[in-house]
Amino acid sequence: PLPGGGRTTLNAPLNAPLNGRTTLNSPAYPAPQQGYGPRPVKFPEPGATLTSARGSYQVLRTLGSGNFGAVYECIGPFDQTYAVKMVRPANRPYAEVQAEWAKEVQRLQSLRHPNVVYIYDAFEDGGLFYLALERCDHPLAAMLGTPMQEGLIIELARQTLAAVQFLYDNDVVHDDIHAGNVLITHTDRPQVKIADFGISTELYGMAAVRPNVVHHAIMAPEILASGYTSRQSDLYQTGLVMFHMLVGSPALDTSAPYEELARQIAEGTPRMRAEAIRTPLGHVVAKMLRRREAYRFGSAREVWAELRELDAWKQRSLFPVK
């Protein structure tokens, strides 16, 4: 989960529903333990067994939990380890939760790419909906806190941008790129996997669409000002992730109230802070964080074309294994 920031609907009062969702800050938002209206459901605990047509999954532990879902480490068919995501009912109608689950399943099955998390199975058990995904080592968020080496930043950005470009080419906007949804697996070098397509949006040939919901701290200026998202919105969010890697702290105080975050986003604070770094990499990040989409990079390919020319990339050393 993103530290400090809830999610908000767009162009609506902060407690108003949009496409079946409400804000996490709203008193109207149900507690995550609730089921489908008055119908309670039992969430899995360590030791529980989940059953699919393809086999069973034994729950080992909870990897992460939020208001819209929880992820469990499980041992599945052939004793392989999986990250099994549960879609939380959150007091919504059964059909709505089923539709959300089916949308994410379809999206992941259609988006096969080395830098997109792989889905192996999808099933319903005990009235709850699950996705069995490849198990990665940890989210990028676990690596943050101090500035990273620029060569490593560019390598992680390269893979993230490859995923973002793949989404662009398939008319999909992720809408939720942050360090918790950028997963890392370590082999001889870090492998990036973009996860959580629960609120992703298909453009259907359009330049921009109204998103379902967005985290306060990663709102692109166009979402805040006009309530729409576009391909450049994902680039803006990727720029925020790169800033965090470069500086060791986020561009915005994620614990700040919504009104303060909105003011800083509207004023271009993230871009100004990136410019203040005064390095070639900082300038690339600053361009990704410009307030107007037309002044950002036109695509993830354009970002990479600049990154690959930086000395930090050309002179990079071997990447750490852990």
Task: Name what the model sees in each region.
Residues 70:
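Conserved N-lobe ATP-binding subsite of Hanks-type protein kinase domains
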Residues 168-185:
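Catalytic-loop of the protein kinase fold
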Residues 156-157:
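Activation segment signature within eukaryotic-like protein kinase domains
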Residues 126-139:
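Conserved short submotifs of the Hanks-type protein kinase catalytic core
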Residues 122:
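Activation-segment/catalytic-loop signature of the eukaryotic protein kinase fold
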Residues 91-110:
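AlphaC helix of the eukaryotic protein kinase fold
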Residues 222-232:
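Conserved end of the kinase activation segment
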